[in-house]
Amino acid sequence: MAKKTRRVVKRKKKIAVDHGVVHIKSSYNNTIITLTDPDGKVITWGSGGTAGFQGTRKGTPYAAQLAADQVAKEAVKLGIKKVDILVKGPGSGREAAIRTFQAAGLEIGTIKDVTPIPFNGCRPKKKRV
């Protein structure tokens, strides 16, 4: 007779943080929003895909708004009151996500644009005609 295997279920640890950092990475194809504690440990995250969108619609501001709403609700549920926002990338979901965090009742400390800009790094691709 085959041996029965037991599944081990890991329980989430209780997080006692009242201040968080929201990382918004917005590309042309998707927007990924991650909520971390000040040390950088991930608390929760969401994206256009987890909000239920597929394909090109993941890159829309509405998809970013719904993803930010999911993350903001989880943050409020965990007792986070104040957030700092770090925005990276050129996508269309940046402003929509920031507005959603304001509307959710979270106090916003700072908003920083941390988009990487090269100091004359790699040669860019040739222009399309």
UniProtKB/Swiss-Prot annotation:
Can you tell which superkingdom this protein's organism belongs to?
Bacteria
What molecular function terms (GO) are annotated for this protein?
rRNA binding; structural constituent of ribosome
Q: Name one Pfam family in it.
A: Ribosomal_S11
Q: Which UniProt keywords apply?
A: Ribonucleoprotein, Ribosomal protein, RNA-binding, rRNA-binding
Q: Name one GO biological process term.
A: translation
- How is this protein annotated for GO cellular component? ribonucleoprotein complex; ribosome
List, alphabetically, the InterPro entries matched: Ribosomal_uS11, Ribosomal_uS11_bac-type, Ribosomal_uS11_CS, Ribosomal_uS11_sf
Give the family from UniProt.
Belongs to the universal ribosomal protein uS11 family.
Family annotation (NCBIfam families): PRK05309.1, uS11_bact
Q: What role does it play?
A: Located on the platform of the 30S subunit, it bridges several disparate RNA helices of the 16S rRNA. Forms part of the Shine-Dalgarno cleft in the 70S ribosome.
What is the protein's quaternary organization? Part of the 30S ribosomal subunit. Interacts with proteins S7 and S18. Binds to IF-3.
What name goes with this protein?
Small ribosomal subunit protein uS11
| Organism, as annotated | Thermosipho melanesiensis (strain DSM 12029 / CIP 104789 / BI429)
The root-end lineage is: Bacteria, Thermotogati, Thermotogota, Thermotogae, Thermotogales
